[in-house]
Amino acid sequence: MNVKKTILAVLVFCSGFFNGYTFEISPEDSLNKNKGDTALTGFQYSRPGTGPFFYKQTLGNLGSAFRSVNFWDERKEFFNSGMNAFKMYEFSENLTPGPSPKERRGKTFSELKFINGSKKEQNFSIKHFQRVTNEISAGLDFGIAHSDGYYSNQVSNLRSFNVYASFQTKNERYNLFANYLSNKIVSQENGGLVSDTAFEITGSFDSKTAAVNFNDVKGLHKSKIFYAQQRFNFFSNRKKPVLTNDSLNISKEITKDSLNAADVSRNRFYLKHVFKYERRSSLFTADRFYSEFFEHAYYDTSKTNDSLFVRNFFNELSLNVENISVLKGKAAFYLAGNHQYFGFYQVDTVNPLSFIDTVMRNFSVRPGGSISWENGLGADIYFEKSFNDLKFDFYKAFGSFHWSVMKNRKKEAEEDEPGEKIFNVEMSLEKEMRNPDFIYSYYNSNHFIWFNQFNPIDFSKAEIKMERFGPVYSKGMFGRNKSFKISGAFYSVKDLTYFNEEALPQQFHERVNVIDANLHHFIKFRKFNLIYDLKYQHADKKEIVRLPVFSSYTSLFYDDNFFKRALYAQFGVDVRYCTWYFADAYMPATGQFYLQDEKEIGNYAYVDVFANFRIKTFRLFLKLEHLNAGFTERVYYTVPHYPMPGRTFKVGINWQFLNDVK
């Protein structure tokens, strides 16, 4: 008992060290003390891509290239560079910056995060939000990380920075949000192991002395983004409208901004302007020509110094009308027009003054709207037409229909409170014709040169989702107790672009069909919790699209309150798995993944054990990743020739401070 009291005293001291701050307990704790805090669920995910929808290809180290194995995983603009392998680590303007609406209630909010792991892996971040006046707010996010890597020549350093501010007039007629983001990733490339056999069968394998393909090869990836959004409301409407479901937030396209969607829904008629400037650069350097790895050295056989730059200007102006009574329902309509100026530049590896550049311009018009009724029925639709320098007929059309069953509101609830959703069905259709990423068309470097004129990609998608929600466990990452979600999608793509077995771009002119099905289940039985995710993917052209047939994530944990409910803790195990498939290989010189037929990977379970702890706003996790490393054959790859790390221990903390001012 004395030991327990000592542990509790230490944790309480840690969580209350700073004077002048009061801590905010989550609503579920204050309303129902015997319920666990779902904010703690998933806290042990220490890296991008290790969450419930985990399965991505990675070279194994923090800061190395990433690729999703979900077919058609990303939503892209009409013009996109294709430099996506490191975006997972970046701060992005598409994410709502700063604290959540709950956290904004206070005058100041701060958050500290720190993760420490084996091989000198350290990850530190800080977040601060300041409400200067009732009309002006500002904030700062900063993150820095370092890792030596589990294998030779894998050192990486990451730095991300985001500063933002918002302004709103007292009558709420005008508001402005702006932020500036800067990301920098320096990652050593080792080209993978020289011999997979030595890794897989050698009894006393030393990861740091194992032979790798590169000695001194690095990739430098930078991005700078300035984003601004302003909105002028023609009428002030301070009374909150009656909302019956989520469809009044217009379409997914419109609500992907940094302003709070609830604030947007209060306005009936407003004009919105979005501006974005983005500059990206990638630098690939090698100390010599690695002839055993690269087939060509077009410019210099002694070294490589390749640069690629992207500049993107984006402006959008939209007129929005919301909460209009139509057909006994509530409707929202908008008309948006945007202009994109896209520049793709490459520097000659020998003569830094020699540029190869491509500039494209695009103008798009997008009308859309949504409608919903009190019986839970709703629909969304939009159409976007592009006019560009390529003279291709680019467009995108989207339509969805959904039905939600809402639990009756309590008598004491506010009149405009929508109630609790317990069942939802959504069906959607999507059709798109767009340009392939620019990297497929133009590239000039020491090891790769190509100039292609590919056809537009013809993309179609049909999807159905069904969700069932059980009683509220707590509002967090995984929703509710006994929640169940199943979805199925059918993709059909003509003129799909990809990188072939020689790491060169190619276009497949036939139609590729893919079936994607997902199952999510969350069950809580007393103190035991089970989270299960299963994905099924099937492509009819397996020679072009390589996907694992099944991939799964399972988390089983026990949670309880200790020390008179002062400490909440979780103890559990995570398991990730996928079936055999010919996973894409990685080309460091271009930062792209390409087809390979030499090595089949998968059929291996990654097992992690963890313990999460929380006192007020102080959280701590202890985690042993890849517990089963070495128990069976060493076949743990997600990318050929790049084995995943072995057994590693990690510890992480998250500390939030809120100065609550009424």
Name each region found by the language model:
Residues 14-21:
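C-terminal segment of classical bacterial N-terminal signal peptides
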